[in-house]
């Protein structure tokens, strides 16, 4: 007799994001495509041997300060190793070594050090991250002469629902210096995120992909003990495969617009402007220009 039973496969579980990436889709709509008050150049190249070079330079139009960074990265895929060297115009040198999916699947260990020859200041950090279905854990240890600081986070996810906790324990003071909690829900085109930081800062964000070319985001924040509430709306529209326009406004009447155009493969230009709606005729508005080159 034929087997009439119908087998249903269990719904695949997704790996939740890290605590720092909760609400990232909404933040990206507010942050990407804008660069007010800066003239910026980013260059990314890759050698034949697989070494990646990233250079970034920017000039602040208000202060005239010029800053830059240089980063080289080499991935030894056979052993899951990544070596990164960093330098910036503050003359701070950084070295990072990471190993991923070698000790066990989903585990990443990172050793990060920085050194400033001008001041002699040194710092070291060991980072660990473990992610599997329904869970994303992180634990970092900052080494300091006064005593290490321990940063921990955990995010749990089930059928689109997310819950996370983040803490920092300062061993020198023997107390928690940070205690944050977040709850969220996400689907393919909708994300909701709420968070409480140290019991005093409350925030929330909504991300909605209205259609294939149009994304919107709403952000709300409030601090207890004050009457200050921060509210903002942002949107991004993809004009065509090579061009997009972004806009945002907040309750302080600050209006930002940005236009991004891919001039050719590997060359991207971004123009942005920030207008103060409360003092439109008084000036103080900001412009921004960014050029990204990748080869």
Swiss-Prot record:
Annotated GO CC locations: acrosomal vesicle; membrane; mitochondrial nucleoid; mitochondrial outer membrane; mitochondrion; pore complex; sperm midpiece
Positions of NAD(+) binding: 254-256, 272-276
Compartments it resides in: Mitochondrion outer membrane; Membrane
Modification sites for Phosphoserine: 205, 252
Covalent cross-link Glycyl lysine isopeptide (Lys-Gly) (interchain with G-Cter in ubiquitin), where: 32, 65, 73, 121-122, 125, 173, 278, 286
Taxonomic superkingdom: Eukaryota
Reaction(s) this enzyme catalyzes, per UniProt: chloride(in) = chloride(out); K(+)(in) = K(+)(out); a 1,2-diacyl-sn-glycero-3-phospho-L-serine(in) = a 1,2-diacyl-sn-glycero-3-phospho-L-serine(out); a 1,2-diacyl-sn-glycero-3-phosphocholine(in) = a 1,2-diacyl-sn-glycero-3-phosphocholine(out)
Coiled-coil residues: none
Modified residues (N6-succinyllysine): 32
PROSITE patterns: EUKARYOTIC_PORIN (PS00558)
Marked site: Involved in ceramide and phosphatidylcholine binding: 85
Family the entry assigns: Belongs to the eukaryotic mitochondrial porin family.
Name of the featured protein: Non-selective voltage-gated ion channel VDAC2
Organism: Mesocricetus auratus (Golden hamster)
